[in-house]
Curated annotation (Swiss-Prot):
Top-level taxon in the UniProt lineage: Eukaryota
Keyword Chloroplast found: yes
Biological-process GO terms, alphabetical: translation
Organism of provenance: Drimys granadensis
Protein name: Small ribosomal subunit protein uS11c
The family this protein is said to belong to: Belongs to the universal ribosomal protein uS11 family.
Keyword Cytoplasm in annotation: no
Gene3D superfamilies registered for this protein in UniProt: Ribosomal protein S11
Amino acid sequence: MAKPIPRIGSRRNGRRIPKGVIHVQASFNNTIVTVTDVRGRVVSWSSAGTCGFRGTRRGTPFAAQTAAGNAIRTVVDQGMQRAEVMIKGPGLGRDAALRAIRRSGILLSFVRDVTPMPHNGCRPPKKRRV
């Protein structure tokens, strides 16, 4: 079983974190933004659902932009200047979250797409007929 990654205190503590990793998971239904330090310990996180969006509005680009802004605001206050971005998933919020991260003033060392792609693995679900 995977060990849980320990969390670094509360969101408001005064730890200085100069460099970190921003993980963006964009599904069709929601966008989750997690900011970790370089060792993988969670510093801050936010999602479209925690920002007050409900139902189908959680999957929108504006909701992803708001979630990314909320997650990054706390780490900018803790002194983060440089970050790497890992984007996962096919959702609409991918570009909007990246735009919000770029606008925050953090220098991005690289942006990597880590969406899992099957090499002809499991059979996909049947196509929807509406």
